[in-house]
Amino acid sequence: MMTLRLAELAQVLDARLIGGDHEITAVSTDTRTLGKGALFVALRGERFDAHDFCDQALQAGASALLVERELPLAIPQLVVADTLKGLGRLGKLVRERINPKVLAITGSCGKTTVKEMATAILRCEGEVLATAGNFNNEVGVPLTLLRLEPQHRFAVMELGANHPGEIAWTTSLARPDAAIINNVAAAHLEGFGSLEGVFHAKSEIFEGLSEGGIAIVNADNEFWPKWRERGIQCAFSLEDQSQPFHARDIALNGQGCAEFVMVTPQGEVNLTLAIPGRHNVANALAAAAGCLALGASLASVKAGLEQMAPVKGRFCVQRWGSLTLVDDTYNASVESVLAGIDALTAMGGYKVLVFGDMKELGEESAAQHARVGHHAREQGLDAVLTVGEQSRHTADAAAGRHFDNKASLFEVLAQMINTHQEISILVKGARGSRMEDIVKMVVDRQESATC
């Protein structure tokens, strides 16, 4: 992070400065990460108030506090009306000072994969700062911007949301030069009320575009006509070869990875992706469109996409002989599960979906879980094993098997691994379902078998 002074921050934040002026070299909302030179931001939530931990921040070595009321502590304090808004303005200040080219990405699914693809492409051009983990909300976005350093030519920002207005705020901080909506699908319906609500929330990302900024959307999405009515022309598509960014001659190789020709306004390039699934062609098109908008070369697009390594929990493939295990456990929206099933069908041997609950689907939950089961059956999967309250609907629709706990499920899965000479397993579920527990069981079994 660039060095800032408290007196300067007081002006930017319209804050009351209590105590002396000091240099600030780090900003944190977590008392466990504090040290000399750090500003501790005391956030408030429905179930917590970090003002209660400011004495711990002082003991941990913090040099100053950002608070909403003066505290009886011997430490400099910046007093503001809203510490969350104050944190955002700090991130915006650093973004303006460093002034990298910024690519912002949102979508109901695939946004992290697009972020990783774009980061790999832009690293071929220069230093890149990218969103780490799930730092994609109204707290994580400013904390990411605060990590910017003078050497960063680019920033790749993932913007998520679980309520209206959140992306409008974070995009106003990031001020992207290009922004991508990867898709709009049934995810976080509880927070937005309907698919139309998700569309409006994701579309907020374009409100913060810098002057001359480029809006990029998925022309295969049902909301494409509405984006087109708004004058958006930069689109990518797997199905419509009239779009500026599209693919042709798509084929999946023996590892399930796509080989295809990417067509862009800057020319064509032959590509072989390093991660499986036809759906990742669309993700690659989105990433390419965003990076080319920031000035990357087509050569960097090819090099970055072909070098990109799988991300843990994001369609990460492990193989032991004829056993293929796909760990896609980080999260699950309906569309990402359907895409995962499609990718599984291209793999070899006995095909098994191990599935946990999806979350935040509201009244649509039962129907959407059943939709997954119907798709698995239509695609001819050999087995569907489910665990969780809602995934029972998936098992019923797929004529699969439902289990009360993961241990019971794994017993049956282990029998399948023993029985079938070649087997491919996709493990999928929402973050709250912790389906990585099943992945660990399989990995531990295989590693112990090879010892």
What is each stretch, according to the model?
Residues 1-89, 93, 346-347, 374-389, ...:
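N-terminal leader/targeting and accessory segments in enzymes
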Residues 9, 38, 57, 90, ...:
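Residue-level signal for inorganic ion chemistry
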Residues 17, 77-79, 102, 127-130, ...:
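Conserved beta-strand scaffold positions in the cores of enzyme catalytic domains, especially
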Residues 47, 311, 329-402, 430, ...:
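Active-site beta-alpha connecting loops in nucleotide-dependent enzymes
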Residues 67-74, 178-325, 349, 374-383, ...:
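Acidic, Mg2+-coordinating active-site environments of NTP-dependent enzymes
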Residues 86-219, 223-232, 415, 419-421, ...:
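Phosphate-binding loop of NTP-binding sites
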Residues 105, 312-314, 432, 437-438, ...:
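ATP-dependent carboxylate/acyl-activation modules
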